[in-house]
Amino acid sequence: VTTQAVSGQSFPFSPIDPRERRISAAVMMSPSMPRRGDPKKAFASVAIPWLLMTGTHDEAPIGKQTAQSRLEVFPLLPPGDKYQVVFDGAEHSAFSDRALPGDSKPRNPNHHRAILALTTAFFDATLRNDAAAKAWLTKDARSVLEEKDVWQTK
């Protein structure tokens, strides 16, 4: 949620604007829907590139975020340099080095290889203006994923 706040999500009930203007691209691991307000408005002002990463079993150990609610963020983002990967079978801990208590799915070592490839290309494309990295994200990123993983761009 912090990354979402500092990189463009709006919070209508907040007296301050949490956006950090020096951030020009951001990666969301386990994106979250807003707890209050209109979700469409919350994400309408995201003006920088975002890469969202989640899994088909990405349930929050605290809070009320579900694997399904995490998938609801991407469609609400405005078009232009927005990307999402959904790792098949991945739980909330897929983005860490170890499983969390209560995890029930076996960890997939390819997820970390894909995370490394996707985030490196994303930051190369967005922060270094690397045309080859951007082309890879839009045309070939699927090559590091497994058959049931989902890759989306807009």
Q: Across the structure, where does each feature detected by a protein language model lie?
A:
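Catalytic active-site module of serine/aspartate enzymes centered on a nucleophile-bearing elbow/loop
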Residues: 103-154
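A short, terminal or domain-edge coil/loop segment
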Residues: 1-6, 85-88, 139-145
